[in-house]
């Protein structure tokens, strides 16, 4: 008769637990990667569709000023497209900064000027998706903000790293300006403790 010692029994239980844990972590990783892939694909498809819709608005537009319709203020509505040619950044700008909106594009910060208005336009985006390349922006870089009304051109004045509580970064200004905001550090895992701010004046 074969006798199994208490130590052997414990060892077998430990091995079973380790195998179960390994399978659990592999499955969890696969689920997480699948979710990320689906989210990125969804965002890409939305950006393509929104870009086409914006091009159609531009084609039939021609207004001298930004038209403030009810739909322009609706969360997730397409406002325009922002481009920074030197760093190959091109992304559709949506109204608002809800979690869903920022998964699909960059968002106009409520309470700041709208495109076509005097003052400071605030735009926020995630550092690990649409605003990832902001880490490569330089002073004097050109920024284009395109809406159905036309293209507004900006030039970067300064770049600053600040606290999330610094509301002054998107404060109203007399001159027409543009402020881009994302989390910082760019490669931080989890909720980043600071904000990376790019400020530009209209040319």
Language model: regions and residue ranges:
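Solvent-exposed, non-transmembrane regions of membrane-associated and secreted proteins
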Residues: 2, 13-203
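N-terminal low-complexity, intrinsically disordered tails enriched in Ser/Pro/Gly
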Residues: 2-8
